[in-house]
Amino acid sequence: MKVLLLLCSCILVIHALPFEQRGFWDFSMDDGMAMMKDEEASGVGPIPTESIPDVGLPPMDLCPFGCQCHLRVVQCSDLGLTSIPKNLPKDTTLLDLQNNKITEIKKDDFKGLTNLYALVIVNNKISKINEKAFEPLQKMQKLYISKNNLEEIPKNLPKSLVELRIHENKIKKVPKGVFSGLKNMNCIEMGGNPLENGGIEAGAFDGLKLNYLRVSEAKLSGIPKGLPSTLNELHLDNNKIQAIEKEDLSQYASLYRLGLGHNNIRMIENGSLSFMPVLRELHLDNNKLSKVPPGLPDMKLLQVVYLHSNNITQVGVNDFCPIGFGVKRAYYNGISLFNNPVPYWEVQPATFRCVTDRLAIQFGNYRK
């Protein structure tokens, strides 16, 4: 009986599935990464073992020491690395090198990585990138290189690039031509750099069809000129912008979210907001406005307005909603006016006649 049990145990071990490492890193990527994982996991059903010729195991790329490799994802984060690891697997699609001490990206660091889809190299000490370092990466769509010591935007970025996150570096200049040929790019995050208006050269964004641009926490004194007219979201929070003039927003007809909070804005010229007919969300909190911006009643799709923490002393009955029989196509679902020196008990109820719910109005915290 003992022999029989031993034989059964051996048979179970022989036919057991190989160990599969799971869940070592749940990197939140888009549908592109999910598709790559599905492709890796897909099969065509069981194949009789007798039909498979014995040709030996194919050569395999070794995982760099200390890294973890799984489903073409190579994770080398938090290892104290001072340079890009050598001999990375050639089929790598996602390379994570964040939270290391890498200081430089050399010419051949990514040689052979022709299938790389995303490179995450956030929070290192990179100050130098060879002009030809990205040449092999002809399929790369996402480059996350924030929190480094870069003083300029890398040159010769892959033409396939869709998303660039380069915030919290030391970049002071966006030269004309640095984004040349990047026709697929739709998202740039470059806040937290010491950028001034004069540092953005005329034509720097020419040819780009961006949907999203963030230049927050910089040193901008006004809304930059010549940004892509295709923008859906523009975030310029935490700068030093003092005024919005009529022509500043004249080319952004597709904009539906505008972030201008935490600036020094005192004045918004009449008609400035009329160029954005599809705007849905407007952030003007933490500025120095003394009144509600003109033109809000004419914005048929506007739903959210942040005006808290300003110097607004009065709110008129027609400051938000259309006059008479004018109709909004979308009612407000969020208006914030708290922390202003306006006596909220003096505001007429009809002021908010085009708000979906009274709970959507954030008032109170009266500031003298």
Swiss-Prot record:
Keyword match Nucleotide-binding: no
Q: Which residues form the signal peptide?
A: 1-16
In the record, the note on similarity to other proteins reads: Belongs to the small leucine-rich proteoglycan (SLRP) family. SLRP class I subfamily.
Concerning SUPFAM superfamilies, the annotation shows: L domain-like (SSF52058)
- Disulfide linkages recorded for this protein, renumbered to the chain, are 63-69, 67-76, 321-354
What is the protein name for this chain? Biglycan
Residue positions the entry lists as glycosylated: 270, 311
Q: Which UniProt keywords apply?
A: Disulfide bond, Extracellular matrix, Glycoprotein, Leucine-rich repeat, Proteoglycan, Repeat, Secreted, Signal
Q: Which GO terms describe its cellular component?
A: extracellular space
From the UniProt record, list the LRR repeat ranges.
Answer: 82-102, 103-126, 127-150, 151-171, 172-195, 196-220, 221-241, 242-265, 266-289, 290-312, 313-342, 343-368
Q: What is the top-level taxon of the source organism?
A: Eukaryota
Q: What SMART domains does the record point to?
A: LRR_TYP, LRRNT
In terms of PANTHER family, this protein maps to: AGAP008170-PA, BIGLYCAN
Functional summary from the UniProt entry: May be involved in collagen fiber assembly.
**Where is it predominantly found?**
secreted
Pro-peptide residues, renumbered to this chain, are 17-37
Location relative to the cell:
Secreted, Extracellular space, Extracellular matrix
